[in-house]
């Protein structure tokens, strides 16, 4: 499966990255606490509610960062508040396990995977994959 990692963590960057998705995609989302949480989540919730491009979402919590993670319970509550509790979702606090779950979902559905919401989540998962697969980070990392 094609997996895309994005450090988008505010409304504008999340909206931009979601707009660039051209194939059905499972979303793995986790972020650090911020003052305007709901404003930051507006683009994600809007896309999940009206766009069939995102058939499933997995919520997780970054392990590192300056601020504490937004809990998976809080993310699920926001989803319910937006009236989109019908979108198939899964919650897993451990981002490593969440990554495996989201990857399996994407593989089973034959769709892509987008990891988004926090630079710390991206860093946690890059470290995990490098260690899990015995990779050299500098050999596999590409920038665009």
Q: What positions do the PLM features span?
A:
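Short secondary-structure boundary/capping segments
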Residues: 44, 130-132
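Structural beta-sheet core signal
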Residues: 27-29, 59, 115
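C-terminal helical cap/extension that packs against the catalytic core
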Residues: 3, 41-112
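Active-site-proximal loop/hinge segments that shape catalytic or ion-binding/gating pockets
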Residues: 118
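Nucleotide phosphate-binding/pyrophosphate-handling subdomain across enzymes
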Residues: 1-54
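Short, flexible loop segments at boundaries between secondary-structure elements
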Residues: 62-65, 134-144
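Short, active-site-adjacent cap segments at secondary-structure transitions
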Residues: 35, 121-123
């Amino acid at each position: 499966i094609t997996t895309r990692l994005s450090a988008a963590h505010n409304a504008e960057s999340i909206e931009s990255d979601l707009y660039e998705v051209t194939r059905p995609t499972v979303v793995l989302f986790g972020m650090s606490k911020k003052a305007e949480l709901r404003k930051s989540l507006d683009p994600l919730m809007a896309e999940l509610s009206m766009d069939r491009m995102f058939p499933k979402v997995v919520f997780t919590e970054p392990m590192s960062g300056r601020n504490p993670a937004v809990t998976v319970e809080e993310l699920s509550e926001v989803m319910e508040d937006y009236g989109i509790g019908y979108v198939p979702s899964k919650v897993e606090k451990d981002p490593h396990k969440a990554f495996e779950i989201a990857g399996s979902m994407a593989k089973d559905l034959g769709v892509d995977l987008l990891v988004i919401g926090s630079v710390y989540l991206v860093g946690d998962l890059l470290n995990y994959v490098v260690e899990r697969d015995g990779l050299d980070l500098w050999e596999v990392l590409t920038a665009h």
